[in-house]
Amino acid sequence: MLAAKQPLVVPMHLRLSHFRLSSYVVLVVSKQKGITIVFKTDPLQNVDINSTFDSIAVIQSFIQREIEGQLRQMFREDLPSIIHRLSQQWVKAKVETPYKKQNQDSLQKAPPPTPTEPVPRPLGISRSRSAGHALETMSTPDLSAPQFDRRRTAASDIHGPAFLRPPLATAPRRPQSTTGISVAGRGSPLSAPPITHPTNSSTSTITSTSTAAEPSTFPDLEHFDPTYGLRPEGLPTKPVFKGFSKLFAPNKGLADLAEEISSQSSSVADGDSDYLSSGSATDEEEYERNSYDFVEWGSTTGPNTTPPEPVVEYETIPAIGGGTITRPRVVHAQSQIQLPPGVSPVASSPSRNVATVLSRTGSGSNGSRSGAVTPGILSRNPSNPYFADRLAALPHIYRPQNISSGPLSAPPIASSSRRPFSLAGGYDGHEDVKMKQRASYAYSVHEEAVYMQHTGGAVNRYPHPYDLERHRYQSESKYDDEDIEDYSDEEDNGRGPHHYHPRAHRTRHEAHDDYFTSRHPSASVPPSSPPRSSARPPSTIKRRLSVSSNTTNRTSFSASSAYKHHHPNHSSLSLDPSSSISNHPGNDKAKIVLRPSLLNNSIHHLSTLSHSNHTLSPYTRSFEHFAVRSGPPRGSGAASAVVKSGSGSGIPTPSTSGAGGGSGMAGGGIGLASGSGGGSLGRAKGLTTTAGIVGLGAATSRLGKTKADVVPKARRKRVFRIGGKKPEDNSNAAPGETDTRNVSREEYGADEIGEGYVEGLGHASGRAGSQMGKRPRPRHRKKPSYAASGTDFDEADMDRYFKSMHDAEEEATPVPRSKDRRP
């Protein structure tokens, strides 16, 4: 593709010739509808297109195909529409003139009635009976016009201003439909209704009976569609398509529904009230009310009985690059992110946390959002299988007092001031019973107390299992530093830290009491164990953050203003785990840290899916029987081999892995140790060496070989040895030297290693550890595998076959091939 700096203009001559059209056409000519033409078959039979680029066959065929296709579409769709619209413009000038003259003649002949004179009854009857041939006094109604134009509000309003009255005597009326959908016809589609004088309204209806006997149109022919038969009677026939203009209006979301309902209900209510307020109904009003025209259905219905639309909730999410995005909140059908109003979360979902339910009871002293449940909290774990608590039988005082179903932009900060006590301020004995009925996941009261104290009493009632593990590690770890500041004086003065860490050996009941004492120092229940002065405040503990700490860390809400309002001795709590501000009252300038994931619950949930079993489904298995262990990664090579050897004197001496130490390197992390002077796998001459093998792939290890030489080989029973010669004497080989040739009588592999380890422990030469296994075949060798399986296949022979081929290629001089059958 070429990028031109300026537009490239290519002159081209194009000529269309040899047009040939042939088709069956249905042609309908009407004074009212104009000319309608429909092609039943493809009209274009042939067209020749010549251009400047006819010499290029590809371009010529492309131009021919494209232009011919466009012409066929034009004849089928565009040409009938063009002809129809042009004919309507011509019919409009011809049709409106006679009716205009009729109206003027009727005005001259008939005297105008008095304004208070009602329309006589026989006239209405004659109009209804002769509706098939009478002239309609109302033109084609526009769908976009208000619907109150078709109604009369009072008897005196019949002769009101002309702009409130519909235009009269512009088109003939269609016959009454047998389907019952419509009884009113449509006038000329493009004819502009003439504005008449107010006195024309009554006189034109009088003259309609005199001209009824002279039909000037043929409705059955005019309303016949040659393609689909009779046209729909209730649809407008104007070609301007005003009825479809609302389809192209800008989308306002759910606001469109509310505006439509309000406008429709208001217009219906106004129309009905105006109609009922009138003292009497005229014949025209009764006729218009009883008719079933397409545009009158909305005005004849009763008041709006549909339920109101629910209030649109909006959520605010942080935008990329700064700022926020406010959008309508979408709650899916199978999502429990937000409970419906009036439904208790305890009854709807039994798997709720005790701390959550207890925290939703208000303190009773403030009328603020004490019991509000923000959707952010409910969406943490709507039906969390990790914490399957059975809370259906909770006392009534622990039920939430008021549940808020506000949007996500509701302030969740004040929720931390909720007190897990009854409204009377006392302590209920049922609480300890319910606290001990924890089920499924090992998320005990002790762990809850530890977690709540580490997070500074935050509102995060659904902690992630990773957070629990991390806080459990912190609470059970030993405090190595001894010069920690003593907080006993501050505790005696009444301003000490209320959050201390219970030890791992404390009972659940003690941790439970400490939890409530630490959360609410004003409680009358004393703790069962005294506070320890050596307890470390949460900020002084060094957190061990894992790789997934940034993604799996739960966002905690900060309790600053509301909590400080009820507890002046408490300072603001910084809930950022990486914050250096402590939570003890000595620091009054603790900051509030809110993370961006606080408002975006979907991304917050998705960030925790670090494993395959972490899903958003409520049917996921719990972590009850899972054991997660972490350790350093083990690679393949000498660095990952753990080898220790002990000499006879009892002093452990680490050996070296590799050829320099005389031991072979095995693939998959196998290290073989050799003592001073060398030795076999488990025993050496003069020294007793114990070699430890740690790693993988011990069955495929080769002594004295590198990684490339320890690939397992298949074996065969009978092999023709290529370039074979007698093995050389390896008695003079230096320690660590390895002969890689003439392996016809040497054994490598798992069976030989097992042989040397079990049967031939004393067969090694002792010169080097790498020569273990490189020995003459022992007298008692294992039976080949084919003997047990009953097949003719021996893996050892096939290994020797491929090894001998490799050795033959390495020979500098060609060796004549000899076929010696191995016994």
UniProtKB/Swiss-Prot annotation:
Subcellular location: Mitochondrion outer membrane
Region feature Disordered, mapped onto this chain: 97-127, 157-221, 263-289, 357-377, 473-588, 627-663, 718-823
Keyword entries, A-Z: Lipid transport, Lipid-binding, Membrane, Mitochondrion, Mitochondrion outer membrane, Transmembrane, Transmembrane beta strand, Transport
Sequence ranges of Basic residues compositional bias: 496-509, 774-784
Single Gene Ontology BP annotation: mitochondrion organization
Cellular component aspect of the GO annotation: ERMES complex
One function term, GO molecular function aspect: lipid binding
Bias-annotated ranges (Low complexity): 161-175, 197-217, 359-371, 521-539, 570-584, 635-657
Biased composition (Acidic residues): 479-492
UniProt KW Membrane keyword: yes
Compositional bias per record (Pro residues), positions renumbered to this chain: 110-121
Listed Basic and acidic residues bias regions: 738-748, 798-807
Polar residues composition-biased segments: 546-561
Source domain of life: Eukaryota
Domain SMP-LTD residue range list: 1-88
The keyword Metal-binding belongs to this UniProt entry's keyword annotation: no
TM region(s), chain numbering: none
Domain comment (free text): Lacks alpha-helical transmembrane segments, suggesting that it resides in the membrane via beta-sheet conformations similar to those predicted for other outer membrane proteins and porin. The SMP-LTD domain is a barrel-like domain that can bind various types of glycerophospholipids in its interior and mediate their transfer between two adjacent bilayers.
Role summary: Component of the ERMES/MDM complex, which serves as a molecular tether to connect the endoplasmic reticulum (ER) and mitochondria. Components of this complex are involved in the control of mitochondrial shape and protein biogenesis, and function in nonvesicular lipid trafficking between the ER and mitochondria. MDM34 is required for the interaction of the ER-resident membrane protein MMM1 and the outer mitochondrial membrane-resident beta-barrel protein MDM10.
Complex and partners: Component of the ER-mitochondria encounter structure (ERMES) or MDM complex, composed of MMM1, MDM10, MDM12 and MDM34.
Protein name: Mitochondrial distribution and morphology protein 34
Organism of provenance: Coprinopsis cinerea (strain Okayama-7 / 130 / ATCC MYA-4618 / FGSC 9003) (Inky cap fungus)
